[in-house]
């Protein structure tokens, strides 16, 4: 996927594409030093990372003012959603090197974020509208970690892969919840789960 195809698909302005191009440049630079993403995914970053993240925008609750992204790593999807206009994005990343990358990527793209360099269980609870995660943990572990936010009324929007059915079965043995499932636009084997109304089973 080219930047032009991405811009037509999402769609976004030329200025936003330029910010994402700057993001990609700093990602490729840092990737030589620390493992931020799977190496082969950089063969098609506009599909594998930027579209993968941007497709969540249409699935966020309306309005979404505060977003909490778990295990942000290289910034997908949280930093992309901040670039695309979510007003207040909190990134949680325990790894200090990855946190340093996120600070630099936010600086280069002129994007306001709130970074929490700590483990999720150490994060104080505050009001959020939606919790996101990609490649962070199995669904049951995500729900357990994010429970203080989800039980307070936040929705969850999570990118998942081929193991989605097994992960849902495990999670639903511990939680009752509403689940909506969407096919990924960036990965034929991927899925997006939108979860709400969560209670312990």
Swiss-Prot record:
S-adenosyl-L-methionine binds at residues 71, 76, 120-121, 134. Its EC number is 2.1.1.170. The keyword Methyltransferase applies. Gene3D superfamilies: Vaccinia Virus protein VP39 (3.40.50.150). It catalyses: guanosine(527) in 16S rRNA + S-adenosyl-L-methionine = N(7)-methylguanosine(527) in 16S rRNA + S-adenosyl-L-homocysteine. One of its GO terms (molecular function) is rRNA (guanine-N7-)-methyltransferase activity. It comes from the Bacteria. The keyword Cytoplasm applies. Pfam families: GidB. One of its GO terms (cellular component) is cytosol. Keywords: Cytoplasm, Methyltransferase, rRNA processing, S-adenosyl-L-methionine, Transferase. It is found in: Cytoplasm. Belongs to the methyltransferase superfamily. RNA methyltransferase RsmG family. Specifically methylates the N7 position of guanine in position 527 of 16S rRNA. PANTHER family: S-ADENOSYL-L-METHIONINE-DEPENDENT METHYLTRANSFERASES SUPERFAMILY PROTEIN. NCBIfam families: rsmG_gidB. This is Ribosomal RNA small subunit methyltransferase G.
């Amino acid at each position: 996927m080219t930047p032009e195809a991405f811009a037509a698909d999402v769609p976004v302005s030329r200025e936003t594409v330029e910010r994402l191009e700057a993001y990609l440049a700093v990602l490729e630079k840092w990737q030589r030093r620390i493992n931020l993403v799977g190496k082969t995914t950089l063969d098609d970053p506009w599909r594998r990372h930027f579209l993968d993240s941007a497709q969540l925008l249409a699935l966020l609750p309306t309005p979404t003012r505060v977003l909490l992204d778990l295990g942000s790593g290289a910034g997908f999807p949280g930093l992309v959603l901040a670039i695309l206009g979510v007003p207040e994005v909190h990134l949680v990343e325990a790894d200090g090197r990855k946190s340093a990358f996120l600070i630099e990527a936010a600086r280069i793209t002129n994007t306001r974020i709130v970074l929490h360099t700590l483990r999720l269980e150490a994060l104080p609870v505050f009001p959020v509208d939606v919790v996101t995660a990609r490649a962070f943990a199995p669904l049951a572990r995500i729900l357990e970690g994010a429970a203080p936010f989800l039980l307070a009324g936040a929705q969850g929007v999570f990118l998942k892969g081929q193991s989605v059915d097994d992960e849902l079965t495990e999670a639903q043995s511990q939680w009752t919840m509403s689940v909506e499932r969407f096919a990924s636009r960036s990965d034929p084997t991927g899925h997006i789960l939108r979860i709400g109304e969560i209670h312990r089973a």
